[in-house]
């Protein structure tokens, strides 16, 4: 059940990865050299994004400039989109994702978003479907505030205590991560680098402090993005910590910080 649920989210990336890995086997020596080079390029591509971790005061993003392309209209200062999400699926249970996304508009210096709870289920016929509840929020003085009354005290507390990973994550040790599993497709273009972490890793310790992670397995860190590695930084940059991934169970945390054109321009 878990396998099919996650395939819904990652099938495109997985198919491309299989193709790339298959091609990489043609020449071990030459491809290892290329892989090492690509690993360095991927780290460099992520460097400016990861330098924003940590930004404890989210209102600092109102004064942060991001990468622009032709989609930005004249005079648009842009909007930062920040998202953090924890997903847990234990054996014979539904997949539950909880997280928040906010949009910080640099033109109006206002921030709105939503806290969400998504449950992915499988019916008696084997069909997988998603049930999602969203709770609109705003941010004032670096504090997340619900826009509507919430009867569920548990959800209300989760919103009050919520912190985005960009507020406490830290990647100052990125250069010490070595021998990553690298994939790269220049035609898409998409790329990724994956590293096995230890439970003593700072970011892993921080995640365990904030979430009930029902496994002692150390996670893998996956950096995946799109765009031209040789220059353009326009594209997405996603971070994922995968603790468990198999056909019966999935436990992973995802995070992203995007810079997009504003909808009010």
From Swiss-Prot:
Q: Where is the lipid attached (N-palmitoyl cysteine)?
A: 23
- Which organism was this protein described from? Staphylococcus aureus (strain MSSA476)
**Lipid-attached positions, S-diacylglycerol cysteine:** 23
> What's the protein here called?
Uncharacterized lipoprotein SAR0402
List where in the cell it is found.
Answer: Cell membrane
Which of UniProt's keywords are assigned here?
Cell membrane, Lipoprotein, Membrane, Palmitate, Signal
Which family would the database say this protein is a member of? Belongs to the staphylococcal tandem lipoprotein family.
User: GO CC annotation: what is one?
Assistant: plasma membrane
**Which PROSITE patterns does the UniProt entry name for this protein?**
PROKAR_LIPOPROTEIN (PS51257)
């Amino acid at each position: 059940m878990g396998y099919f649920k996650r395939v819904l989210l990652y099938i495109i990336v997985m198919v491309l990865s299989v193709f790339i890995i298959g091609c990489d086997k043609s020449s071990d020596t030459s491809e290892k050299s290329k892989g090492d080079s690509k690993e360095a390029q991927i780290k460099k591509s992520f460097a400016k994004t990861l330098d924003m971790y940590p930004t404890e005061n989210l209102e600092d993003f109102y004064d942060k400039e991001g990468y622009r392309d032709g989609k930005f209209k004249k005079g648009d200062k842009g909007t930062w989109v920040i998202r953090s999400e924890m997903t847990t699926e234990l054996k014979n249970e539904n997949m539950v994702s909880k997280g928040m996304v906010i949009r910080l508009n640099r033109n109006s210096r206002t921030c709105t978003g939503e806290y969400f709870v998504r449950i992915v289920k499988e019916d008696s016929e084997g069909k997988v479907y998603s049930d999602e509840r969203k709770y609109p929020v705003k941010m004032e003085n670096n504090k997340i505030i619900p826009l509507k009354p919430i009867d569920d005290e548990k959800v209300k507390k989760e919103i009050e205590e919520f912190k985005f990973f960009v507020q406490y994550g830290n990647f100052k040790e990125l250069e010490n991560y070595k021998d990553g599993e690298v994939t790269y497709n220049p035609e898409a273009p998409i790329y990724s680098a994956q590293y096995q972490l230890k439970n003593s890793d700072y970011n892993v310790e921080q995640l365990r402090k904030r979430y009930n992670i029902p496994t002692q397995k150390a996670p893998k860190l996956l950096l995946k993005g799109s765009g031209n590695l040789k220059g353009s930084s326009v594209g997405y940059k996603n971070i994922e910590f995968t603790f468990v991934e198999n056909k019966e169970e999935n436990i992973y945390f995802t995070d992203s910080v995007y810079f997009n054109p504003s909808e009010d321009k």
